[in-house]
């Protein structure tokens, strides 16, 4: 289960490595997140957040997260 802090991090934390380095997690392409699910999410908080981002995208709930972005 996720915590509300996870939602804020999804909206603001940037991908630290890879093809989409620097992109906010909730804005990562679904195909990229599906690839991670197939290969295995990274361990720790980043993996948890990537899995959560995928679930929000699959359910079409990205619009719930985007208002939490801090300018």
Residue positions per predicted region:
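DEDD superfamily 3′-5′ metal-dependent exonuclease/proofreading module
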Residues: 1-71
């Amino acid at each position: 289960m996720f915590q509300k802090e996870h939602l804020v991090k999804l909206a603001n934390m940037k991908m630290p490595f890879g093809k989409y380095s620097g992109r906010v997690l909730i804005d990562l392409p679904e195909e990229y997140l599906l690839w991670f699910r197939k290969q295995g999410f990274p361990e720790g908080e980043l993996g948890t957040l990537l899995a959560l981002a995928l679930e929000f995208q699959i359910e079409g709930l990205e619009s719930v997260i985007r208002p939490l972005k801090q300018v």
